Swiss-Prot record:
The lineage of its organism: Eukaryota, Fungi, Dikarya, Ascomycota, Saccharomycotina. Signal peptide: none annotated. Residues 30-694 are extracellular. It is a single-pass type II membrane protein. Residues 1-11 are cytoplasmic. This is Beta-mannosyltransferase 8. Glycans are attached at residues 101, 542.
Amino acid sequence: MKFPKLRKRTVYWAVLTVFALFTIHFVFQYKEHNSHRVQPIVLIPKAFPSLILNSFDTQNEELVPIKLLKNCQIIRSYHTGYEENTKLLGQEPQSNFHKFNFTVFSSMKPIGLDLKQCQLLSSSSQVEVNDAVNMDASLHDILGKLLQDIRHGKLEYLQEIAPFFLPELQLQLNLNIVDRFWYRFSGSSIWLDQYNMYFMISRIAYSPHGVKNQPVVSLTYGQLFDRNWNEVKNINLLVPSNDPSKNGGHDSFRIISFPYFLPIPFWHDIDNTDGNYFGPEDPRLILVRNKQGYEEPLLIFNSYHRKFVHYDDDEDSIMGQTVKFQRSMFMCWPWQYQMGKSNVEGTSNPEYDNKVYNRVIELKVKLLADMKSQKNWTPFISEDSTNKFDSYIYFVYRWANLDVLKCSLLGDVAGDCVFDYRLDETLVPQNKVGPLRGGTQLVNLRQVIPRSVYHRLLPSHREIFIGFARTHLDNCGCGKVMYRPNLVILVKDAADKTYYKISHISSSLSFDVPIIGWNVYKPDDLCFDSNVLIPYSVSNWNITSLELDIEGGRWVSNDQLTLTLSISDSTVHRLDIRGLFQSILDLADRSLFIPVDRETRVIDEFQNGLQNPGSNPLNQDVNSLGVNNDNIVCALDASVEFCFEYGAKFSIPKQEEFYEVEQQEFNEELIDPKKHQYFKILGKYLYDHASVNS
């Protein structure tokens, strides 16, 4: 009778021993795994308060996510061992530069819009460019991660937008055809000096029919790149932020993991996508300095949204309300947040009120309140304020018949805009802006030229802004439409009032970038439908040297600018340009800078003219100083000629046929068996099933 009992005890102790050994082994393996596990890396800004970082005072939990930081490898961007320890920086890429010539039109000789006299305004310039680099990213990997995050319940924002593309996305991934329905382009980037990183955002658009100019939803994807343009994945930034639960008024820091989809709020109606394009479009980044002294990115975009507008019913004297839909311009702070999205929904909605989104504000101009569509504003920052932070952002609203907007960044009036300058006060603001529009942000030369030299080049009341607008030309000789960059130089002079002028503008610029056809199945057919090369951002502009050559009577510089572009709304490219600042210094009319041989006298004359409105030539004859449209029309005329010559060279002889969407889909399915298989599966197992249960 005791034997069975002993046997049970033996088994009991044997099991207990095995369990104990397994537990010890598991704990040992876990510790061994943790000892080799790489800690998450958090980059902190150079200006981050050392006292907070060193103390890890839990009393600062509202200001800094201390608990998260304790589990991370913390690195300042300028850490001496940064490159060796993290291996984030690659080798300097080898680039082949070649000379590129282009024509620039000045504004100093009035020609009365006579195109026959454009040669009086034209001069030749030269820079060096390298081969454009395709900053390709695997859409399969990006969207695979997106699907994984949605399934794991990560981020409420992703759950909200998932019905736009689920369950179709899973099938697209299985068949490896996501690039037939998803498109990544509109890459815009800025250099974050506090982190020694490039911050890039790009637009990822989804078209259920696979027609790239008819996406139902657009998302914004954020990435980080090191100084040599190697993407840095699985890294975190500690950024200055706000507390959305306290109405944005509480300063704090937040950790953002890269890469990621920015949770930008937008109004949408998933059940009504026909003809509606939801989400942020044409994103542009620009750097601003906030009231706390930190530089942070600001994102400019346009988006379709809903408003509830009050109106007066004259019959019963009761205020009524109607729904209004329009496409408007917005500002987004990627490092700041808000609760809910009533500012894009038009009203409070319990479904979204407790969700966290990026902070956005609509840009509003009273004179333009009734316009159904606003887009293609060109942003820039002026340093005319005595504050140490940016209170306003400026926009070129219209290039031809120049209009400049000034919009507040701060307080309750953030987003309110007024016209800071109008070339033609009689022009109705709602008039079409013309073929020259949008493009990159404009770079203030004060942010590029060393402070020690700036006052020797420009009087204190002048600012110069450089960027690349884009020309939109219809039926000019190559397909239905052509887009190309144009170099633009905007000058701001402060006299008794503020004056702006487009001092110089180039014709269309190819930068010798090879174009791919709009139709992905016919990439060599360059003049089918659209021929597109669009500039999106000046990522960086570095002047490595700037010296005065007294004997030669000129300034000599070395500089390099990085430009991002998109080809055929399908790519994100970057291009390096050397010598652009030197070409601007050497412009034939010498109207921008103080002449070397007359430095002191010119400064005195210019300053006196600004301080004495009666003697200021701007008040006497603005046309004589180039405040006109002469160089604009000359540049556009040259751009049309560029398009015509391009079409003559690259058009494939055939009868033009522009199909409707249904016909285009049918033709592509014949060419692409996988796409045909995809729609066949959807029709059999998804759409038919859905219709039965509807």
